Amino acid sequence: MIDLDFRKLTIEECLKLSEEEREKLPQLSLETIKRLDPHVKAFISVRENVSVEKKGKFWGIPVAIKDNILTLGMRTTCASRILENYESVFDATVVKKMKEAGFVVVGKANLDEFAMGSSTERSAFFPTRNPWDLERVPGGSSGGSAAAVSAGMVVAALGSDTGGSVRQPASLCGVVGYKPTYGLVSRYGLVAFASSLDQIGPITKTVRDAAILMEIISGRDENDATTVNRKVDFLSEIEEGVSGMKFAVPEEIYEHDIEEGVSERFEEALKLLERLGAKVERVKIPHIKYSVATYYVIAPAEASSNLARFDGVKYGLRIKEKGLREMYMKTRNVGFGEEVRRRIMIGTFTLSAAYYEAYFNKAMKVRRKISDELNEVLSQYDAILTPTSPVTAFKIGEIKDPLTYYLMDIFTIPANLAGLPAISVPFGFSNNLPVGVQVIGRRFADGKVFRIARAIEKNSPYNENGMFPLPEVKA
């Protein structure tokens, strides 16, 4: 085994390796997974062996794919019993682009079932553990992807973000997580949760690596009508700093319970940006306080429609019963976990004729208000800044109450409701656990979001050799 520390190996560093070293990267990744994953449990499926083709600029670099993104030749389970043995007949567009660029998919990462959760405890198979503390959650729903990168099992990963599911686990695991502007990345091959909110995004060790992956996976796709034919440059201005920029901090975030250490790191990040020549001001965004409530009407409604296809007829689990109705009911009751069933029921209720106007339609109006207010602020400021998560990683099994659990995404949900680009960049610790700072930008100003995040990363007093230090998992 070549002497390379995967915890410190970035995409850019991989490009500097010799041809012989790059040939061995996928096997080294598999060996690291074999050694560490019994403790971290980041993967649902892992390839037994991989072949390396020297095609594409990024050939040989090992990555993980969240297990709700379709991959040819590997299971796509969505961490659900109902799709436990499902194999797709095609690659998702993002996977196809990654493979064409030369990346090697070594495994499929664990998640909360159908991406419904914020801790990766709600996988039908097993909870994933945070590499910083194996008794704690990695966040979710892309917890497996974040943990795999944080533990140094892969160089990078893809996740999906519906209400913070890339950014929140990135924050809790001390890595970078990016949600693009809605429409920049194809959702073709992503098993839908809430179609108007879902976006695929990268999880990496550095901001530059995330921008590199966005250059690869973004672009118009004829298979996804919501993608836009618009070229965004993610890298050309990434090193230009923040001098002269203006940032907005919503006053409403201070109305919520924020862990003391998280609040301290956030204020420290704001002072850093001011020292770098930026101006930071507090602003009012009145309707942002309704983001979580709005999300938990709209997302379950869309999920109840999207998940109706999993009925035991065409693919996935099928429980034999006497009649069709009984088969439907038994299959869905056995195949879906508690949280998925809860959200399907909520969504079905809010879409019903008697309650559609009172709940779903009203939530859509509030969503528009939130979006308008965010866009108004962003017309006057370069970005909105918040903590990524109000807390650091909590202990597995600690949170039982669904409402407390839902509030984990209180700072990340607004960007999904408005379709805005947002990134979580690691910045220091609270009680020896990573803290993330979130940057939210204007639609299609993804390049500027990366530029701001890079300035934070580049000047952070907590980073070593240009990146946040990652933990050593005791195997």
From Swiss-Prot:
The active site is at K66, S141, S165. Keywords: ATP-binding, Ligase, Nucleotide-binding, Protein biosynthesis. The keyword ATP-binding applies. The keyword Oxidoreductase does not apply. It catalyses: L-glutamyl-tRNA(Gln) + L-glutamine + ATP + H2O = L-glutaminyl-tRNA(Gln) + L-glutamate + ADP + phosphate + H(+). One of its GO terms (biological process) is translation. It holds the Pfam family Amidase. GO terms for molecular function: ATP binding; glutaminyl-tRNA synthase (glutamine-hydrolyzing) activity. InterPro entries: Amidase, Amidase_CS, Amidase_dom, AS_sf, GatA. It is an enzyme of class 6 (ligase). PROSITE patterns: AMIDASES. GO terms for cellular component: glutamyl-tRNA(Gln) amidotransferase complex. Its EC number is 6.3.5.7. Heterotrimer of A, B and C subunits. NCBIfam families: gatA. Allows the formation of correctly charged Gln-tRNA(Gln) through the transamidation of misacylated Glu-tRNA(Gln) in organisms which lack glutaminyl-tRNA synthetase. The reaction takes place in the presence of glutamine and ATP through an activated gamma-phospho-Glu-tRNA(Gln). Belongs to the amidase family. GatA subfamily. PANTHER family: GLUTAMYL-TRNA(GLN) AMIDOTRANSFERASE SUBUNIT A (PTHR11895:SF151), TRANSAMIDASE (PTHR11895). This is Glutamyl-tRNA(Gln) amidotransferase subunit A. It comes from Thermotoga maritima (strain ATCC 43589 / DSM 3109 / JCM 10099 / NBRC 100826 / MSB8). The gene is gatA.
